[in-house]
């Protein structure tokens, strides 16, 4: 089963340990699918690949050629390895389960990270793995450098205060108007992304959650508009977020960036 370790605060599941390798271990795992923002049923396979990279995990839906969920622990920032400019496919993942190439998207869309490189900058190999295309999806440039970046900066600052559990995912939706990259990359463009950050334990547990639309309107100054309750995340995605009941039902106030936070 899955639980939070009372000493390390690490949320994990007991499974047979895979052999050590420089790349991820590919596992088949059944988890709940994702729903649309309007709660219409979405066609997401229940047979997902779990990819355990160094320091983070991604769940991949072969039918989408892309991820549906990600998770990692963000600990105190002790590193400064730089992000690579190279994006590559994962040789351990079947071709039919991932994008066609690692090239840029264009059309004002970035190669957007689910798990940001900066949060794995303690390890040269881990930060390199974040540029694997299984961790990348088309994100509107304004959103990737705006509201989504702001959620990453909140994580960056608060991980120096508490160890954080970060869980997030993809809301693929059903809007075909932005599916520019089906021919070039084999992947549709998600309609939104979600993220939950959890800190503290027991009565001190706190969490904040966002659903960020994948659009040019999702600028930095609108980040707080996208804060939702964890109950809403669970309702929209079908996920069960590992937080106490008292944390689920009210929207969090914004987590203010602490004065003097080093976002690098």
Question: Which residues does each predicted region cover?
Answer:
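Domain-level detector for secreted/extracellular nuclease and nuclease-toxin modules, and
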Residues: 23-264
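Post-signal/leader-peptide non-cytosolic segments of secretory proteins
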Residues: 2-25, 67
């Amino acid at each position: 089963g899955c639980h939070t370790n009372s000493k390390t605060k690490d949320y994990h599941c007991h499974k047979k340990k895979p052999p050590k390798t420089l790349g991820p271990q590919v596992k088949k795992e059944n988890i709940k699918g994702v729903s649309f923002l309007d709660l219409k049923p979405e066609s997401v396979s229940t047979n997902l690949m779990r990819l355990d990279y160094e320091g983070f995990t991604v769940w991949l839906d072969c039918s989408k050629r892309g991820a549906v969920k990600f998770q990692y622990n963000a600990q105190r920032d002790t590193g400064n390895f730089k992000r690579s400019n190279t994006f590559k496919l994962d040789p351990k993942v079947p071709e039919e389960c991932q994008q066609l190439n690692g090239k840029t998207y264009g059309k004002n869309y970035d190669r957007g990270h689910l798990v940001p490189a900066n949060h794995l900058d303690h390890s040269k190999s881990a930060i390199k793995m974040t540029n694997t295309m299984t961790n990348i999806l088309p994100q509107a440039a304004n959103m990737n450098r705006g509201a989504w970046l702001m959620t990453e900066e909140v994580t960056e600052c608060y991980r120096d205060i508490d160890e954080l559990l970060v869980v997030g995912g993809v809301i693929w939706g059903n809007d075909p108007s932005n599916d520019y990259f089906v021919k070039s990359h084999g992947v549709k463009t998600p309609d939104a992304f979600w993220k939950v950050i959890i800190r503290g334990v027991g009565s001190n547990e706190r969490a904040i959650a966002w659903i960020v639309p994948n659009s040019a309107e999702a600028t930095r100054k609108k980040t707080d508009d996208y804060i939702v309750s964890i109950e809403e995340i669970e309702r929209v995605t079908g996920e069960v977020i590992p937080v106490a009941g008292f944390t689920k039902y009210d929207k969090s106030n914004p987590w203010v960036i602490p004065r003097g936070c080093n976002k690098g």
